[in-house]
Design a protein with these regions (language model features):
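Short amphipathic helical patch at the helix-1/turn junction of helix-turn-helix
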Residues: 1-2, 109-114
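Conserved tyrosine-mediated DNA breakage-rejoining catalytic core shared by Y-recombinases
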Residues: 3, 7-8, 12-43
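Helix N-cap/coil-helix junction residues
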Residues: 5, 56, 90-92, 129, ...
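Active-site-proximal segment of tyrosine recombinases
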Residues: 9-10, 105, 113-129
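Key DNA-contacting residues within the recognition helix of helix-turn-helix
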Residues: 11, 106, 135-139
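Catalytic-site neighborhood detector that most strongly recognizes the C-terminal catalytic loop/helix
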Residues: 28-32, 127-152
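C-terminal catalytic core of Y-nucleophile DNA break-rejoin enzymes
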Residues: 29-49, 60-82
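Short basic/aromatic active-site micro-motif
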Residues: 92-111
Length: 155
């Protein structure tokens, strides 16, 4: 939720990549492109707390492993998210790994609403999209803009 990474890239992360560092780089599995990420102080603290709580076998261990020591699958994580949604009666239409990535994008966009074009350029780079049009479609902005037309109509 703090990075906008695809779940496939999160599952490949190791503790030594993210522990006690302000930045780290990955090669995205889907695109093969390099991506550098910054870890803000709040997330750095959370990572340290998780590491101390989990006490992984090695600093080179994956960050998301089951109690059996195996790396979670995307499908399993989505099942857990659905269980969380049900348990806490979350009023969310879609609650999955992918929807969390989109939520990250929408949050960045909404926080920069005074300069939405710059926000879209930033998100295009963060998501490694090839165009702003793809980023807008990914975030559902075009559809939202169309639907907002109905809100301003008066009779």
């Amino acid at each position: 939720c703090f990075t906008g990474l695809r779940i496939s890239d999160i599952l490949a992360l190791r503790w030594n990549q993210i522990l006690n560092t302000e930045e780290f780089a990955i090669i995205e599995k889907k695109t093969g492109k390099k991506r550098t990420l910054r870890i803000n102080p709040q997330l750095q603290q959370h990572i340290v707390e998780c590491y101390e709580q989990i006490q992984p076998v090695s600093v080179k261990s994956p960050i998301l492993v089951s109690q059996k020591g195996t790396i979670f699958t995307i499908q399993r994580i989505n099942v857990v998210l659905k269980e969380i949604k049900k348990k806490y009666r979350l009023k969310v239409k879609n609650f999955s790994c992918h929807s969390l990535r989109k939520t990250f994008g929408r949050q960045v966009y909404n926080m920069n609403s005074e300069n939405s074009e710059l926000a879209l350029v930033k998100l295009m780079e963060l998501f490694n999209h090839s165009s702003i049009a793809i980023t807008k479609r990914y975030l559902g902005l075009r559809q939202e803009e169309i639907l907002e037309t109905y809100d301003v109509l008066s009779f």
